[in-house]
Amino acid sequence: SGQTIISGMGELHLEIIVDRLKREFKVEANVGAPQVSYRETISKAVEHRELYKKQSGGRGKFADIQFEIAPIEYFADYDGKKDRISEEDGFMFINEIVGGNIPREFIPSVQKGFKAALENGIQANYAVQNVGVRLFDGSYHDVDSDQLSFELAAKLGFRNSAKKAKPQLLEPVMKVEVTTPEEYMGDVIGDLNSRRGIIQS
């Protein structure tokens, strides 16, 4: 769309950036309403099997994966081999495949499929974070299995299993300290409450 997206800690922060663009850099920008950057996550462990099969005349598609998805903390005490774990950007992938149930060359495609699925969200299409996946079994077909089949199986598998894993919407939360004269205390508390603020003391 040719848009440039600016991000900040709140509306005031964004207004200051836009003001500086106009004042210091002489950039006249059409600015839309700010959007809150939500995220999604899951809150429960779920085991799932995804069997991806397609037959269309010639060579078909086949991939079979069995995995467990859970919040990353669920795997904190994982006692398997550490070299089977890869972790980045709020996503943990544990490969427990042994004995060639899924050939080694297809494992990166499974991981890639899960990572791509995280970008599309579960409930509201916001990026998903804090998710761990433990791939523990599966099968393949000598002719019909390929990298794309396993990538698609992972995408579909995440979508189908995440719905059962108690998905939750996350929103940005900030901790602030407010100092105000006593006569304005009621107004300030009312304003904070209207914005779903939680007053601690």
What are these regions (language model features)?
Residues S1-S201:
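Accessory interaction regions appended to the cores of large information-processing enzymes
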